[in-house]
Amino acid sequence: MAALSKSIPHSCYEIGHTWNPSCFGSYLQITQGAMEESFKIYAPLYLVAAILRRKNLDYYVHKLLPELLQSTSFLTANGSLYIAFFCILRKLLGRFYFWTPGFGAALPASYAAILIERKSRRGLLTIYMANQATEALFRMGVTRGYIKPIRHGEVLLFCITSALYMFFFRCRDGLKGFAFSALKFIVGKEEIPAHALLPENMYVKAEQKSKEHRGLSRNSLKRLMDIICKHGPRHRCCKHYEDNCISYCIKGFIRMFSIGYLIQCCLRIPSTFRHLFTKPSRLLSLFYNKENFQLGAFLGSFVSIYKGTSCFLRWVRNLDDELHALVAGFLAGISMMFYKSTTISMYLASKLVETMYFKGIEAGKCPYFPHADSVIYAVSTAVCFHAAVMEVQNLRPSYWKFLQRLTKGRFALMNRKALDVFDSEASKNFNNFVPKLDPRFCIVKPELPLDFS
């Protein structure tokens, strides 16, 4: 708490924009760099999204560019307004306090910036930044000894989140939209309660028709596989009519393992092909990389454990119950041991909280707060900026790289050595970096002792 009462008399040039003594000149440089990088980030993102959603020609002609420029303006404003409020606060207060270089300057800048962005994107941005801020605050608590980290905590969080997600998935009107479609794709329609409304004889008839239509072209191996899959233990409550319980789980594992393996391969293609001509041997690493198999094992085991547990509980209890999804979902979450990811756990947990909150609003049990997404985004972004200034070691490395890219590397040029007086180890990861300042624009000369009032 003693650090909160301290202050330093340095100017905004000596602490913040050390590369340029002019506040306005620094603002223009940050704006230019942020605009270039924002456009590079959003241009391919919007183009790929439009292609995947199969937008018509009218969208490309009339809507794509305005939406792209709006998002670019939002991200540019978030960076440029931060340096603007950084200088404004210094001039208004006359000194720098613990909260002003990071949180104080980023809060109004982030709130003003998010109002520029389209409303349809604010919710997603809020969840993303809330995840970043929560992780940063957690690391701050661990650093200060306020919080004791739990071993495999991200796996435990994923287990709890998975259990609740699968329970809502099994309940009628529990999940809607993308979340429902995604889980339906992952675990299959056989686990949807509405699927039980379709009588078994419909599947038998469809199966017989497909046999008659394709019987001539099937080989003996295919026929043997059908016999193995369909002639085995299957509980009367199980809706996987074309498989027994064992083959149902095995097929689920193979399918999602293949999808996870291919996804990770596709993600590695750009970095691999950059070195195709200089190091051709790296092409083999695209297919034999450890992470490819880890993601495949994670997705495959998640589905097989969930399906296997669901079938087991139907056999044991002799009924199909939505509560089975809680147990099956929790056990399936252990599959994250193959592919540990705090990002995935935090994101899904945040989306779950959002889902439950909106369900509470629909039920009339939770109050609705207008502009809550904008406020949460502003506070979360301010926390992340504060961590980036005062204790970057507690910020997620990927977000620090993003800030560096957005500011063309200028975020690392801040005089964090002078901020060490606030006891946050601001210069810890910067090798005691001290910027070269023009003495003509300095309030505090390097050789003079500082007065911390």
From Swiss-Prot:
It is found in: Mitochondrion membrane; Peroxisome membrane. It is a multi-pass membrane protein. Belongs to the TMEM135 family. The chain crosses the membrane at residues 68-88, 96-116, 149-169, 293-313, 326-346. This is Transmembrane protein 135. Pfam families: TMEM135_C_rich (PF15982). One of its GO terms (biological process) is regulation of mitochondrial fission. InterPro entries: Tmem135, TMEM135_N. GO terms for cellular component: mitochondrial membrane; mitochondrion; peroxisomal membrane. Involved in mitochondrial metabolism by regulating the balance between mitochondrial fusion and fission. May act as a regulator of mitochondrial fission that promotes DNM1L-dependent fission through activation of DNM1L. May be involved in peroxisome organization. Keywords: Membrane, Mitochondrion, Peroxisome, Transmembrane, Transmembrane helix. Signal peptide: none annotated. The gene is tmem135. It comes from the Eukaryota.
